[in-house]
Amino acid sequence: MELIQCIDEMQSIAQAARANGKRIALVPTMGYLHQGHASLMVEGQKRADLLVASIFVNPTQFGVGEDFDSYPRDMENDMRIAEAAGVDLIFAPRAADMYPADYQTYVNVEELTLPLCGANRPGHFRGVTTVVAKFFNIVSPHVALFGQKDYQQLAVIRQMVADLNMPVEVIGMPIVREADGLAMSSRNSYLSPAERVSALCLSNSLNAVRTAFCKGERSVAALKNLVLDMISKERCAAIDYVEFRHGLNLAAVDTADEQTVVALAVKIGKTRLIDNRVLGEE
């Protein structure tokens, strides 16, 4: 496995691979890898001849007062996990190369970025789509893999790819959870032991909603109250949003069906966690 930091070098490798008829898969990450990331890499290996994982804590998707400076970083461990998962190249560019002093071009998906995480994180998705578009141009992947834990992000990237006619197949992969149900996240490392227990209110409330839905409840108001009641019992939990949305276009819904996605953002102590559940999926 190689570590590439130079953009020009990465582009040259990708162009040569394509010229030789190789399929390229890309797994974009911000590092501090866990088994959720590894699952994307294992799937990427099945779908391509050259598997590239990017590791880049992207400054343009963090807002003022967010955790860019404190975001966990561990390149040595990341390289171990990536290599074990079958990654051929790690692309870890420097921020100064990705965004030089005279940088002024951004990609913005308009409507899908307004609700959910976009409502309280202005500019976040503009940063996400810009860096992903840059990675697509640099790595030239045939396929790119993203986790469904960031459900809105996946929808936004799919919209960007469709709107801009990017020749990339975007694959969404299921959420990988800890044994007790907590969705794997690099930010879980911020949690104290007590907060780690409290954080289970996210997955537990999603499971409760799924159970109620399977028993016939279709009222979004009733299902939402179930989530709110469960999370509000945790003293260190502060709800950012609890939303029921159409699974494809993220439009708000009043009546739940199998395509409805329940999306949560909750602060546990100082740590903002997200999770989601599509009601029609096991």
From Swiss-Prot:
Coiled coil: none annotated. The keyword Glycoprotein does not apply. One of its GO terms (cellular component) is cytosol. ATP binds at residues 30-37, 147-150, 176, 184-187. The keyword ATP-binding applies. It is an enzyme of class 6 (ligase). Its EC number is 6.3.2.1. Homodimer. Catalyzes the condensation of pantoate with beta-alanine in an ATP-dependent reaction via a pantoyl-adenylate intermediate. This is Pantothenate synthetase. It comes from Geotalea daltonii (strain DSM 22248 / JCM 15807 / FRC-32). The lineage of its organism: Bacteria, Pseudomonadati, Thermodesulfobacteriota, Desulfuromonadia, Geobacterales.
